[in-house]
From Swiss-Prot:
GO terms for cellular component: plasma membrane. ATP binds at G386, K387, N388, G389, S390, G391, K392, S393. The chain crosses the membrane at residues 34-54, 69-89, 147-167, 168-188, 260-280. Residues 34-317 form the ABC transmembrane type-1 domain. It is a multi-pass membrane protein. It holds the Pfam family ABC_tran. The gene is nisT. This is Nisin transport ATP-binding protein NisT. GO terms for biological process: bacteriocin transport; protein transport. PANTHER family: ATP-BINDING CASSETTE SUB-FAMILY B MEMBER 10, MITOCHONDRIAL (PTHR43394:SF1), ATP-DEPENDENT PERMEASE MDL1, MITOCHONDRIAL (PTHR43394). It comes from the Bacteria. Residues 352-592 form the ABC transporter domain.
Amino acid sequence: MDEVKEFTSKQFFYTLLTLPSTLKLIFQLEKRYAIYLIVLNAITAFVPLASLFIYQDLINSVLGSGRHLINIIIIYFIVQVITTVLGQLESYVSGKFDMRLSYSINMRLMRTTSSLELSDYEQADMYNIIEKVTQDSTYKPFQLFNAIIVELSSFISLLSSLFFIGTWNIGVAILLLIVPVLSLVLFLRVGQLEFLIQWQRASSERETWYIVYLLTHDFSFKEIKLNNISNYFIHKFGKLKKGFINQDLAIARKKTYFNIFLDFILNLINILTIFAMILSVRAGKLLIGNLVSLIQAISKINTYSQTMIQNIYIIYNTSLFMEQLFEFLKRESVVHKKIEDTEICNQHIGTVKVINLSYVYPNSNAFALKNINLSFEKGELTAIVGKNGSGKSTLVKIISGLYQPTMGIIQYDKMRSSLMPEEFYQKNISVLFQDFVKYELTIRENIGLSDLSSQWEDEKIIKVLDNLGLDFLKTNNQYVLDTQLGNWFQEGHQLSGGQWQKIALARTFFKKASIYILDEPSAALDPVAEKEIFDYFVALSENNISIFISHSLNAARKANKIVVMKDGQVEDVGSHDVLLRRCQYYQELYYSEQYEDNDE
């Protein structure tokens, strides 16, 4: 999709092959309302033909003998009432169907996005796809279905009107089809161009969203204000938006030129047709009522033709989108097709072995990890140290199942990671990430999200809060677990960075897991809080596998075993004293840290 391809009839029909899949998806999600809309539109489609015949008879009766005039007026009134009722009913059902379908598809999309791998979210192309499918899914599927229904309804009404004109002159009826066919070809070309432009600018649209996000949230406000860079971002936003406007105006100009050209041809045909009808009236071959109804029929043909062209344009344009949506939804069915064994998921893990492990990030040729061999045992506290970029965080993401190894294996009590279902990692591993989430939710939710089955066990929540010293969450010397945290919502309580980190730690420890992993757990903590956390972590490691990443070698000294990493490889493994004697790289890290501490 990197370049605009020339529109062809073959490509057009190939794109329309998504229609059966679209209809199948819609009927799976909202079958009842889809049927309601089809029935209502089918009934409505035949009303115009009935109206033409009634209107014709009404005028001829008024100008003629007046026989059956009352009956015709009553029938005309009934038809108008039915038309109004059907229109209102169709509008209500259509609105309800739109809302329900949008909800159902968004739920499906969220399930798909939640089943993606972490590596998917580390690629810009995936963000662009997610941006487009989530943004357009709120209206495109309904727009496509509605366009199909209206297209069929308009087609029936068009044939009815052509049949009505054909009763006077079949040649004129055929002539009136020229403009719709010509319009179709021209507008489909524009439709393809419009879709490709919108799809290709997904990255830029995401950039505008990000700028708005920066300018409207507290986390970035301080730097933007102090550095006086709001105008920089506003200018950047305006430049991108102007580019979008210029692209949209170019498409609008093309549509306008086509419309002017087609309207000229259409009006020319209409004038010639009406002139021929007038000649027939003057020759006594056509009644006035017939003339008026035929002119109305021509007007309806023009209306239905334009409606059909617009809807074919919409069908084609939205079908291009649906191709991308279906490609994205397929990801849900291919992710984590592994053995599903409840017993495996629930057993307590005692050993993790990393064997000949190497990892290369997508779209990269460099090894982030290379030939890693390690073991982690229950009852053992392991620290992983090294400079930034040494592969520490990548390693724990592989151990926790967020990445799959490029080469080598991970064994959990001799069970290979490649065969483990996602549920295994979710039940057995609890991780504090360096970029932990600050949930703008209640205390209960902030802690209980790691184990939803225990979210309403107040005693369990309070116990972990007390163990980690989260007294700052108390109100009148007690925890009110439904207190809102953060300042995004009403009655929220703002917290410091260190307080948010302690809450994230409490959430990590609240989960009953076999393996606990902390990535820079003391980055925002004061010395007292750091000691409390590590004391609790050491106690926790007696019956579990416990791993933590740290830049601080003083913190690492608390571990039974220290893994030293350098440039994606394991430099050495041992206790602090052993490493200080035999590992030159560890010595460099240690003395560098001591120098910095003394310098302070």
